[in-house]
Amino acid sequence: MSRQVTRLLGSLRHSGGGCSGSSKVCSLTSLVQSRSFGTTPPPPAAVFVDKNTRVICQGITGKNGTFHTEQAIEYGTKMVAGVTPKKGGTEHLGLPVFNTVAEAKAETKANASVIYVPAPFAAAAIMEGLAAELDLIVCITEGIPQHDMVRVKAALNSQSKTRLIGPNCPGIIKPGECKIGIMPGYIHKPGKIGIVSRSGTLTYEAVFQTTAVGLGQSTCVGIGGDPFNGTNFVDCLEKFFVDPQTEGIVLIGEIGGTAEEDAAALIKENGTDKPVVAFIAGLTAPPGRRMGHAGAIVSGGKGTAQDKIKSLRDAGVKVVESPAKIGAAMFELFQERGLLK
């Protein structure tokens, strides 16, 4: 199996979207120079992002911001600017750098931001994006203090313009069009499956498997594993239900909280003719012990994997007991329903 994985990833790396990372066929400079700021913001995307999404990077001049902005540009994402206080008026990776998000938005008509800012300052960066009324903020930063995120959550709930994905998440990608975050772009393939996950690495596993069986992905959203996040399963499912490109849905959850139960309730109440496959991590986790993510903890007898699995199965979801079975389970459902073309 490992040899098959290596061969597939190698072929994807050489044939995938964007420029080749090793050959550097197209330089960052030429990619950036081909972008025009335009005069109006882009139209709304079907599932949060698409080829028209115009992205700024908060923390662009830092190590992580530099590396992942470079990767995003090579993939084809419309990165239009960066924001670093006191460095306004300079350039980095061929992009203009501004002191504030408001200045960057006004100049470039950006509608999305990705945040690579250290944890003590990340909440302030999110609040700055909210104040600028961006459509989307993707916060990658891990370890933001919970009391900071309580303030952010209150601010999010008091408005309806801006959506936050994260924090502590891999980001979001529409394969072949827009990559915002730290996921390896080359393993993705444009296709039919919408993926939403609390786990970054398990997202990559689901991506690999749906690519391997020839289904590909429509949009992949990593919502993060913190107790206080901006986007949940229900938000993503509602988008996937009405997105014509999404023909199947993969949901990857874990112990802690009630997000998976809420998703099951939505599926049961609204119904969907799209096949849904789920995996819940933490089946053998002991109560009261945090398992990786800050939100991955069973407390007060609630949030167990067993409860989540039962709720999802009662809603008609195919729940697999191993992440290695996600792709095969989805392929079988497509076969049973005559959805393969």
Curated annotation (Swiss-Prot):
Residues 1-37 form a transit peptide. Keywords: Ligase, Mitochondrion, Nucleotide-binding, Transit peptide, Tricarboxylic acid cycle. GO terms for cellular component: mitochondrion. One of its GO terms (molecular function) is succinate-CoA ligase (ADP-forming) activity. It catalyses: succinate + ATP + CoA = succinyl-CoA + ADP + phosphate. The keyword Nucleotide-binding applies. Substrate binds at residue 204. It is found in: Mitochondrion. It comes from the Eukaryota. The active site is at residue 293. CoA binds at residues 61-64, 87, 140-142. It holds the Pfam family CoA_binding. Its EC number is 6.2.1.5. Pathway: Carbohydrate metabolism; tricarboxylic acid cycle; succinate from succinyl-CoA (ligase route): step 1/1. One of its GO terms (biological process) is tricarboxylic acid cycle. Heterodimer of an alpha and a beta subunit. Belongs to the succinate/malate CoA ligase alpha subunit family. PANTHER family: SUCCINATE--COA LIGASE [ADP_GDP-FORMING] SUBUNIT ALPHA, MITOCHONDRIAL, SUCCINYL-COA LIGASE SUBUNIT ALPHA. Succinyl-CoA synthetase functions in the citric acid cycle (TCA), coupling the hydrolysis of succinyl-CoA to the synthesis of ATP and thus represents the only step of substrate-level phosphorylation in the TCA. The alpha subunit of the enzyme binds the substrates coenzyme A and phosphate, while succinate binding and nucleotide specificity is provided by the beta subunit. This is Succinate--CoA ligase [ADP-forming] subunit alpha-2, mitochondrial. It comes from Arabidopsis thaliana. The lineage of its organism: Eukaryota, Viridiplantae, Streptophyta, Embryophyta, Tracheophyta.
